C-alpha cells in the first residue's frame, strides 16, 4: 500500500471510531462561551450572543460567518441587585410577540445566589436593548436549584423556562403569556444523583412528535489549569419526551431525573469539552446543533473556546451529528 493511502485509511478509520463530524466552518469573531443564536425576521441576519462583556453579541450573514462583534447587550450591567450584576452569563434569545427577548443569568461562579433576567429589543441593533430586571426566577441556599442557564420554550401558546446548574440540576417553570415573568413554581425535569450532579445548560427543541431536552454534563471550565480526568469534561447529552413538561428518558429508557442522558457530542479529535449548546433551525441547513468547544490545536483556556456547529440528523428518532 502506498504510504499516503495508508495514512488516509487510518484517518478515515479514526473518523469512524469517534463517529462525530468536525465542527462546521467559522470565520471572523469565533472565540465564544455559551452561545445563543437567532436569525432576524426582517432581513435574515444572524445574531449570536455569549457570556462575557455584559453579554457580548455579534452578527453575520451566515452561521459560518464572518462574525462581526456589535458590542454589549447591557453595557451598564443588570438592574438585578446581586453579586455578578456586571458579569452576566449564559444568554438565551427568542422572538416573542414581535420583540426579541434576551434572557441572562446574574450570579457568581459556584454561588446559588442567582437570578434570571430579561432584556428586550425590537431590532437587536446596538443600543436598542431595554433591561427589565428579574423574571421572578431566583435562587438562594434555601432552594434545591441554581437559577442560571435559562432557556425559553414555546409550545402551543404556552411558554416554559428551563434552567438550572448543579445542585438538583434542571428545572422548568411555566411563564406568563408575555414570557416576561414566571407564573407558577418550578419542577425538576433532569437530575444526575451521582457525584457533584454536574448537569447544566439545558435547551429544549421539538422535532416531529418528540420534545428533546439537550443538556451539558461534566466539568465546563478551567482546562488550562486543571484538566479533569478523561471523560469527565463537558459533553452534550439528550433525553426526549412526548410532552414539553416530561417525562424525559434517554435512548435506553433511563429517566432523565435518574441520571439518564444519551451522548450527542463529546470530545473527539481536536475537539475537547463541547457544551453550552443550543439548537437552531437554519433555512438552508435544517436543524443545527451549536456549542462552544476547545480546539486543542489552539489552547485550553476559557477565553480560547470556539464557536462550533453541526447539522443534526433526527431520522433515527434521536439526534446524531
Curated annotation (Swiss-Prot):
Catalysed conversion reaction: Endohydrolysis of (1->5)-alpha-arabinofuranosidic linkages in (1->5)-arabinans
Gene behind the chain: abnA
Site positions (Important for catalytic activity, responsible for pKa modulation of the active site Glu and correct orientation of both the proton donor and substrate): 149
UniProt EC number: 3.2.1.99
Task of the protein: Endo-1,5-alpha-L-arabinanase involved in degradation of pectin. Its preferred substrate is linear 1,5-alpha-L-arabinan.
Domain of life assignment: Eukaryota
Main subcellular localisation: secreted
GO function terms (MF aspect): arabinan endo-1,5-alpha-L-arabinosidase activity
Gene3D superfamilies: Glycosyl hydrolase domain, family 43 (2.115.10.20)
Active site: 34 (proton acceptor), 200 (proton donor)
Location within or outside the cell: Secreted
Signal peptide: 1-19
UniProt protein name: Probable arabinan endo-1,5-alpha-L-arabinosidase A
UniProt keyword annotations, A-Z: Carbohydrate metabolism, Glycosidase, Hydrolase, Polysaccharide degradation, Secreted, Signal, Xylan degradation
Nucleotidyltransferase found in the keyword field: no
UniProt xrefs under InterPro entries: GH43_arabinanases, Glyco_hydro_43, Glyco_hydro_43_endo_a_Ara-ase, Glyco_hydro_beta-prop_sf
Keyword Zinc-finger in annotation: no
Pathway: Glycan metabolism; L-arabinan degradation
GO CC annotation: extracellular region
Gene Ontology process terms (BP): arabinan catabolic process; xylan catabolic process
Similarity comment: Belongs to the glycosyl hydrolase 43 family.
Amino acid at each position: 500500500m502506498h504510504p499516503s493511502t495508508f495514512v488516509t485509511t487510518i484517518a478515515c478509520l479514526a473518523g469512524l471510531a469517534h463517529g462525530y463530524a468536525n465542527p462546521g466552518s467559522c470565520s471572523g469573531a469565533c472565540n465564544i462561551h455559551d452561545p445563543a443564536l437567532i436569525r432576524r425576521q426582517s432581513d435574515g441576519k444572524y445574531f449570536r450572543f455569549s457570556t462575557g462583556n455584559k453579554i457580548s453579541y455579534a452578527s453575520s450573514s451566515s452561521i459560518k460567518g464572518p462574525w462581526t462583534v456589535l458590542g454589549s447587550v447591557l453595557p451598564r450591567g443588570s438592574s438585578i441587585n446581586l453579586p455578578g450584576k456586571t458579569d452576566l452569563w449564559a444568554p438565551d434569545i427568542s422572538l416573542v410577540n414581535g420583540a426579541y427577548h434576551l434572557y441572562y443569568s446574574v450570579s457568581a461562579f459556584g454561588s446559588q445566589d442567582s437570578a434570571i433576567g430579561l432584556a428586550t429589543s425590537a431590532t437587536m441593533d446596538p443600543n436598542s436593548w431595554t433591561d427589565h430586571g428579574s423574571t421572578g426566577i431566583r435562587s438562594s441556599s434555601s432552594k434545591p436549584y441554581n437559577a442560571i442557564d435559562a432557556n425559553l420554550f414555546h409550545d402551543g401558546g404556552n411558554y416554559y423556562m428551563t434552567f438550572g446548574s448543579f445542585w438538583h440540576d434542571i428545572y422548568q417553570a411555566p411563564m406568563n403569556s408575555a414570557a416576561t415573568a414566571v407564573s407558577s413554581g418550578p419542577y425538576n425535569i433532569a437530575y444526575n444523583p451521582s457525584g457533584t450532579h454536574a448537569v447544566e445548560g439545558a435547551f429544549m427543541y421539538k422535532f416531529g412528535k418528540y420534545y428533546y431536552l439537550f443538556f451539558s454534563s461534566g466539568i465546563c471550565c478551567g482546562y488550562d489549569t486543571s484538566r479533569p480526568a478523561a471523560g469527565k469534561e463537558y459533553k452534550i447529552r439528550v433525553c426526549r419526551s412526548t410532552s414539553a413538561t416530561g417525562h424525559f428518558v434517554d435512548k435506553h429508557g433511563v429517566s432523565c431525573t435518574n441520571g439518564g442522558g444519551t451522548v450527542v457530542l463529546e470530545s473527539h479529535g481536536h475537539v475537547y469539552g463541547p457544551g453550552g449548546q443550543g439548537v437552531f433551525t437554519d433555512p438552508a441547513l435544517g436543524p443545527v446543533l451549536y456549542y462552544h468547544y476547545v480546539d486543542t490545536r489552539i489552547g485550553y483556556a476559557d477565553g480560547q473556546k470556539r464557536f462550533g456547529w453541526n447539522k443534526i440528523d433526527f431520522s433515527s428518532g434521536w439526534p446524531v451529528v
